[in-house]
Amino acid sequence: VNSLSVLSTHLTELVRSYAPDLLNRQMVQEMLNQLKSRSPASVEGVIPEMISLSEFQSILRNLLRERVPIRDLSGILEVVANNATITRHPNILAEAVRQTMAHTLSSLYRDDTGTLHVFTLAPQLESALRSSLGATDSGVGFQVDASLAQAIINKTGEQMEVLAHSGYMPLLLCPRELRLAFRR
């Protein structure tokens, strides 16, 4: 590995980690303008009719925070349009986009043999968390006591380290209704 490729890798990671903060409204508007010139129907009727530019910016930032590619702006807008009649909450709309892109996202993390290395929750814990789901300011969250929350955080951290030390991206595979709350 030469020093140029190491530098390139570090710069790429740096940009990825700060991408949500770098994505401002002007950039989002320019992206939408480019899409509108190619595919007007993708944008018209969605922004600002269904959601505002700043709400869409929040959705894109949420996706970038989780390293979800936002290249398919037309597809993202379609998912947002299909779900904006139910909610305008950026976290929930970003989650709908993630779920729609599940196949694409999983392909990003498969190894050379096509295997996806993940860890999962114990069925009893999954059940307990499912029954503790409740609404929060960020959309949805778990309403569990502090000791259980800390135990979950500790065990999750351990499992993430195991995967990372094995050279894999640490991924938790859980039911979609738990994912957003677990992420937050």
What are these regions (language model features)?
Residues V1-R184:
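Membrane-embedded alpha-helical signal segments
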